[in-house]
C-alpha cells in the first residue's frame, strides 16, 4: 500500500487508503464465504471454457450494478481469483481510479494544513465506522453542484457555490478548512435573507424589475420657490389663510410678468439690497401705524431704492435695440397693473372696505403719480445734459426706459405695505363684489307636519307578502294588486262593522267575545265552524299562540299545557 499522509486532501483515493489502513486485514468468516470457497475450488478444476462462463455469472450475481460489472469480471479473469470482500473491492477501485479527484477540480487538490479542531474527530472516527467519518471530512462549500450529498439541501449549496464563484471571478476559494466552514455558515445566513447577485449572463431582462423612476432634484427651482416665499410679507401669508379671501394683486407671481435680463453677481447683490429695503416696510408700518406722512415718506424712499436697483440691473444692457423690448414689456405690464388698479379702485368705491380705505387708496395713488412724474423729470435731465459722454448715455437710456415702471413699483409696494385690516374690516372684505362661488338659494322647507304613512296600507302590504309566501309560486304584480284590493275591502268592512258594534253596545274595550259575535253576524263563524277552528285553519301555530291562550282541535291541545 502507498504511504498515508494524514494532512492530504479528502479525495476518493485518500479516503480509501485510510479505510484500508484502519480496517482489519483478515475478513471474518461468514456462511457466504464458505459457498464462495466451494465455487472457487470448482472453478479451479473446471475447463477453461467452463471457467470463463461461470466467472461471468458469479460476477453478475455479486455486483448488482452496471458500473462494477466490467471491473469484477476483469479482476476474476486475471490469474489470481480472490474473494469479493470490501478490502478487495477497495483495492480494485484504487487500481482503476484516476490520480485526480472526481469531486473537486484540479486547482483545489493541494495540501492544506488541517486545523486542530478537526483532528480529534478524525482519531475518534478512525476507530469507528465509515459513516461517521465521511460527513465530517466532506467540505460543504467545495462540492461540485452535480455531486451533492443526498441529505443536504441542494438549493443552498448551489447558491453558495455560485455566489463564491461570482465573488472570486469563477475561481473557487483556496482558504483553509476552518475559514471555509465559517464562510459557509455566514453565507447560508445571508442566503436566507437576501437574494444572491446573479451575473450578467444569467439575468433575463424580460423578468427583471424596472427601477423606480425618481425625478432629480432641481436646485434652481427649489431656490426660486424659496426666494418667492421669502419675498411675501408675513401679513400677506396670514391674510391668505382667511376664508373667502381675495387673491392679492401684488402676490409673488406678478414678478414673473416682467421681462427678466440675464443675472450677474453684481445684479444679484443689488437685488438683495432692494429686497432688504422692501422687507423693511412692514417694520416701518408696525412702528408708526398712525403717522401717514412718515409712512408715505418711507414708502417713497423704498420705491426709489428699488427703482435704483432696477436701473442697475438694466444698466448692463447697452444700445437702443436692447432697450426697446424692455420698454414694450414694461408698457404691457403697466397696462395690466392699471387694469388691476382700476378694478381694485372700483371695489373700494363700492364700499366693501369702508370710506377710510378709499381715501387712503386715493392718497397712495396720488403719491405714486407724483413720484412717477418726478422720475420722468429726473430721467429727462441727465439724458439731455450728458449726450456726448458714453457712460452718461448708458445711464440715461435705462432711466428713460424705467421711468414708467417706477409707478408700477410704487403701486406694488403700496399693495405689499398696506396695513393689515381690522377684524371688522376683514369680515367686510370677505364679501366679494364679484361672487367667486355661486350660492344657490336654499330650498323652501314646508313647516307643516310630515305626511305619515297609513298604517292600514302598511298592514295590507304585509298581508300581501304573506299571501305570496303561502301561494308557493311566483305571482304577477297585477295579481298582488288585486289581493291588496280584496284585503282592503274586507278589512274596511270589518273595521266599520266593529266600530258600529262597539258604539252601539257602549264598549270601551273590544273583547274576543265581541269580535266573535260580529263575525257570527257576518256569517264567518257558525255553529259548525267556531272561531278557534277558523283561526286554526287560516293561521299557523306561531300566530295562534299570540292570539288565543288555548285552541282545541279534536283530542289535541295547542299549545300543549
Swiss-Prot record:
Disease entry from the Swiss-Prot or TrEMBL record: Short stature and microcephaly with genital anomalies: An autosomal recessive disease characterized by growth failure resulting in severe short stature, severe microcephaly, and delayed and dissociated bone age. Additional features include global psychomotor developmental delay, pubertal delay and genital anomalies.
PTM text: Dynamically phosphorylated at Ser-47 and probably also other sites during the cell cycle. Phosphorylated at Ser-47 during G2 phase, metaphase and anaphase, but not during telophase or G1 phase.
Primary location class: nucleus
Modified residues (Phosphothreonine): 85
Keyword set includes rRNA-binding: no
Lineage, broadest ranks: Eukaryota, Metazoa, Chordata, Craniata, Vertebrata
Compositionally biased residues, Basic and acidic residues: 18-27, 357-367
GO molecular function: DNA binding; protein heterodimerization activity
Protein name: Centromere protein T
Chain residue ranges for the region called Flexible stalk domain: 93-421
Amino acid at each position: 500500500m502507498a504511504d498515508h499522509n494524514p494532512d492530504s486532501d479528502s479525495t476518493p483515493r485518500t479516503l480509501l487508503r485510510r479505510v484500508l489502513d484502519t480496517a482489519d486485514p483478515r475478513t471474518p468468516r461468514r456462511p457466504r464465504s464458505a459457498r464462495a470457497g466451494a465455487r472457487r475450488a470448482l472453478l479451479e478444476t473446471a475447463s477453461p471454457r467452463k471457467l470463463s462462463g461461470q466467472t461471468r455469472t458469479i460476477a453478475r450475481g455479486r455486483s448488482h450494478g452496471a458500473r462494477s460489472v466490467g471491473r469484477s469480471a476483469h479482476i476474476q479473469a486475471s490469474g489470481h481469483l480472490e474473494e469479493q470482500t470490501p478490502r478487495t473491492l477497495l483495492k480494485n477501485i484504487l487500481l482503476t481510479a484516476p490520480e485526480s479527484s472526481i469531486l473537486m477540480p484540479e486547482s483545489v487538490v493541494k495540501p492544506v494544513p488541517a486545523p486542530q479542531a478537526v483532528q480529534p474527530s478524525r482519531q475518534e472516527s478512525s476507530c469507528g465506522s465509515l459513516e461517521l467519518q465521511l460527513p465530517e471530512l466532506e467540505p460543504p462549500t467545495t462540492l461540485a453542484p452535480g455531486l451533492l450529498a443526498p441529505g443536504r439541501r441542494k438549493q443552498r449549496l448551489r447558491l453558495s457555490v455560485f455566489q463564491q464563484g461570482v465573488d472570486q471571478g469563477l475561481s473557487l476559494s483556496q482558504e483553509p478548512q476552518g475559514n471555509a466552514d465559517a464562510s459557509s455558515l455566514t453565507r447560508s445566513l445571508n442566503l436566507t435573507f437576501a437574494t444572491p447577485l446573479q451575473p450578467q449572463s444569467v439575468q433575463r431582462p424580460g423578468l427583471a424589475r424596472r427601477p423606480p423612476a425618481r425625478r432629480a432634484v432641481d436646485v434652481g427651482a427649489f431656490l426660486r420657490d424659496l426666494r418667492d416665499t421669502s419675498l411675501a410679507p408675513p401679513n400677506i401669508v396670514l391674510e391668505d389663510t382667511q376664508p373667502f379671501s381675495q387673491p392679492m394683486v401684488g402676490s409673488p407671481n406678478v414678478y414673473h410678468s416682467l421681462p427678466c435680463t440675464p443675472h450677474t453677481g453684481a445684479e444679484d447683490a443689488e437685488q438683495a439690497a432692494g429686497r432688504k429695503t422692501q422687507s423693511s416696510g412692514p417694520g416701518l408700518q408696525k412702528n408708526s401705524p398712525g403717522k401717514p406722512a412718515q409712512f408715505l415718506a418711507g414708502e417713497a424712499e423704498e420705491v426709489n431704492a428699488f427703482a435704483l436697483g432696477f436701473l442697475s440691473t438694466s444698466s448692463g444692457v447697452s444700445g437702443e435695440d436692447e432697450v426697446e423690448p424692455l420698454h414694450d414689456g414694461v408698457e404691457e405690464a403697466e397696462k395690466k397693473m392699471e387694469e388691476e388698479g382700476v378694478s381694485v379702485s372700483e371695489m373700494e368705491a363700492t364700499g366693501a372696505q369702508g370710506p377710510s380705505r378709499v381715501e387712503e387708496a386715493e392718497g397712495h395713488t396720488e403719491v405714486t403719480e407724483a413720484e412717477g412724474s418726478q422720475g420722468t423729470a429726473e430721467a429727462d435731465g441727465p439724458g439731455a445734459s450728458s449726450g456726448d459722454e458714453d457712460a452718461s448715455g448708458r445711464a440715461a437710456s435705462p432711466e428713460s426706459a424705467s421711468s414708467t415702471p417706477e409707478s408700477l413699483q410704487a403701486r406694488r409696494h403700496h399693495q405689499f405695505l398696506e396695513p393689515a385690516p381690522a377684524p371688522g374690516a376683514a369680515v367686510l372684505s370677505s364679501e366679494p363684489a364679484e361672487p367667486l362661488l355661486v350660492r344657490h338659494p336654499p330650498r323652501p322647507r314646508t313647516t307643516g307636519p310630515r305626511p305619515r304613512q297609513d298604517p292600514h296600507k302598511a298592514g295590507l302590504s304585509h298581508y300581501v307578502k304573506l299571501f305570496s309566501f303561502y301561494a308557493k309560486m311566483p305571482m304577477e304584480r297585477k295579481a298582488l294588486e288585486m289581493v291588496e284590493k280584496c284585503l282592503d275591502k274586507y278589512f274596511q268592512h270589518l273595521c266599520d262593522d266593529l266600530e258600529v258594534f262597539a258604539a252601539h253596545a257602549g264598549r270601551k274595550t273590544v273583547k274576543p267575545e265581541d269580535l266573535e259575535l260580529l263575525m257570527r253576524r257576518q256569517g264567518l263563524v257558525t255553529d259548525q265552524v267556531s272561531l278557534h277552528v277558523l283561526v286554526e285553519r287560516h293561521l299557523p301555530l306561531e300566530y295562534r299562540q299570540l292570539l288565543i291562550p288555548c285552541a282545541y282541535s279534536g283530542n289535541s291541545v295547542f299549545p300543549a299545557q
